């Protein structure tokens, strides 16, 4: 809501709000780095939560409003694959799904002119893992962790590329090539 309070808008209401926030990382629970776990939750869950909170006054001021929150297929199934641990990401996306389902009832009872839904997209060919590494200052493609390489390998495999037997450095080079293009 601090964001909302600091902004000046040309209108006092909005009719639709899209909350789409995501960052890879956080990784495993067993050997987590707390700051990475927190950052994953801060973006993936709290990005959606604070988006709703910041713009709720403008939605309430409208004749009718709609909120669309983006979770992930990993908010249904907590797995990218058997060799990739991403507990923080899945937990955050489950939280978005649960928050949205609870918000639907909350709005129905307290603001029936505002509706809400959650979108659960499947794996989409983005560079979320790589972009996250760069945002966190972990370097480029050649510095990708084995977890990030496994994630990108699964993405390439899903796209139909025969990458199962490629060495990890070849996967890193493929990602680097995509970055440079």
How does the language model describe each region?
Residues 28-29, 36-38:
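Substrate-binding pocket helix/loop in short-chain dehydrogenase/reductase
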Residues 78, 83-95, 99:
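The catalytic Tyr-X3-Lys active-site helix of short-chain dehydrogenase/reductase
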Residues 20-25:
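Conserved NAD(P)H cofactor-binding loop of Rossmann-fold oxidoreductase domains
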Residues 109-181:
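SDR active-site lid
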Residues 2-4:
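Short, small-residue-biased leader/transition segments that mark boundaries at the very start
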Residues 52-53:
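A short, exposed helix-loop element centered on a Lys and neighboring polar residues
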Residues 72:
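Residue(s) in the substrate-gating loop at a strand-loop-helix junction
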